[in-house]
Amino acid sequence: EDVIRDIMNEKGITGFENLPINLSICTVDTLTTDECIFTTKEENLENEHIHYITGAPLETAVRASMSFPAIYTTCPYDKYNFIDGGSKDNLPVKILRDMGVGKVLAIGFDIMTYNPDAGLGGLIKVIWRALDVYSIDGTRESKKMADLAIDIKNENTQLFSMDSVDETIQEGYDAIMAHKDEILKVFGEQNSAE
């Protein structure tokens, strides 16, 4: 959380309350297995197995959303013990719809493409693929609920490889630019800029 807080300080951000937009950050509580959504403002929503949390430190919410199982430790806060929200809902379109968001652009990595390998690399890939299996049906449904869904192809990128960060960013940019006309058609041109 200290690193996140330092970045926030550099940007002049003290918390949710002074962000230029409403922000929702998804995570999962390991104690209840419920989804938990950190929000900028009180949403007054009641959904079974979803907790809406306001008033939490922004750095805690960001840290909680990064708590990828077996890579980072969980993030304890209040009565919760958080892990990455993608563990349960890898494309939280329904959450946004429930919160009244008008149009939703769903952007995610292409998890439908899978090429098994032999050896240790293949073992690691199959472990990650097993995790995909748990959320893939939800991801499919989320794509249907979005106004537009875009897959980022990144088959050459290794999960958690810092050497691949620039390549992954470029692949994301390329995916968006390849769909630019469609995005502008669905969401309007009021904020178009390259």
Where are these regions (language model features)?
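Patatin-like phospholipase
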Residues: 1-194
